[in-house]
A protein has these predicted regions:
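Residues lining hydrophobic/aromatic ligand-binding pockets adjacent to catalytic sites
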Residues: 1-130
């Protein structure tokens, strides 16, 4: 088993961070559609052995009326609010997930954190959606 130690986000300049830690969890991917060029730059700058994990974009997990969307630069059309979040099996959630997968592939990430809000709850229906 290999142990990874890192932070949620870069707490130091990236060049320094890569010499101190061997993993980072990218939280910025939660708030907005991942910036592909930025992710490519992260992967290029990091040592080959450096590991990335990222949070899935909130369009997959969080309905549009939750406060986490206040930090987002790109908010989907509010008229489609019942089509986003809660891991719903909708075209919009699947398209959002494809963007997460693309980001993970660019980073060669081994882990994608799917963080659901407390309102997702534990019920038979939500467990089945997993």
């Amino acid at each position: 088993m290999k142990t990874y130690v890192g932070c949620c986000g870069y707490c130091l300049a990236r060049s320094k961070y890569y010499t101190v830690f061997n993993v980072v969890e990218l939280q910025e991917t939660f708030y907005d559609i991942p910036d592909i060029d930025k992710l490519k730059r992260y992967r290029y700058e990091a040592p080959e052995s450096f590991a990335f994990s990222l949070k899935a974009w909130q369009a997959v997990t969080h309905p549009l009326d939750l406060p986490t969307w206040r930090k987002a630069k790109n908010v989907p059309d509010k008229s489609l609010s019942n089509r986003y979040g809660f891991l719903r099996p909708t075209k919009e959630v699947f398209e959002a997930w494809e963007k997460v997968v693309e980001a993970a592939e660019i980073l060669n990430a081994k882990v994608v954190v799917i963080q659901t809000p407390p309102s997702f709850g534990i019920a038979k229906k939500t467990i089945e959606m997993l």
